[in-house]
């Protein structure tokens, strides 16, 4: 099964496998050492399958209600149509309501992930209230970038957790990371003081195609086929993106990004509270997923 980015096939010679970590057999220091060494932790089946299924079905039901999924909606097949704008006055309000589904929050802000990050930090952790739920239809992918410019305004002690709610085979656009990128000095120098909301003349997106980027750095593009309940954790300078969803069965990819930090660290008010306003202050309306499934995405 091919991996594509912007319709371009990734040469198999450039692809590598993500190293798996068994969190139940790892000490806190071993988890931190793996993050330091690889720039990520790949955790299989970390979330209870029943919790994942419940959240997925609840999200899919909402997408079906705006005519974006075919029946049976639990299969997650895109209809290629949408009544989202006809039925909802505000895209941001709609996506905020989807992102607030109780079964979803039991996963994203539940005890399992909180405990994982408490082990990583060596102290109690807390997840952002503002989450990045992504429903990804055919032809879409996330451009390569690192997260520092979005989330490190108040504290540098932030990690991203990417959770799969559907089967994410190679044709459905799994996450990838550039091998060793968390140690690329030029990346750290460029993004250490960058804030995408303040420095509007710059972009967080790395314009170089991942194929060229990996070749120039003699690196690999690391990925895997993800199962529901799998998670990938990585730091703010790990260069990553997603492959293109080009699945012939028209099934969407449902994943979610959650950020965690130590509870003792100061909190960025953009991402915490009852109604956080997100990176730019536009709330959930700023997210690509606030757009109907059949509409193109932006990049920043």
Predicted regions and their residues:
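Non-heme Fe(II)-dependent double-stranded beta-helix
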Residues: 2-37, 44-144, 150
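Short, conserved beta-strand element in jelly-roll/cupin
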Residues: 152-170, 225-228, 233, 259-263
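A short beta-loop-beta micro-motif enriched in histidine and acidic residues
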Residues: 113, 122, 146-158, 219, ...
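Active-site region of the double-stranded beta-helix
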Residues: 123-126, 148, 153, 163-174, ...
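Non-heme Fe(II)/2-oxoglutarate
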Residues: 2-20, 65, 69-73, 189-193, ...
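Double-stranded beta-helix
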Residues: 170-239
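Phosphate/oxyanion-binding loops and surfaces in catalytic or ligand/nucleic-acid-binding neighborhoods
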Residues: 62-66, 123, 168, 184, ...
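Short edge-strand/loop segments of extracellular domains
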Residues: 136, 178-185, 257-265
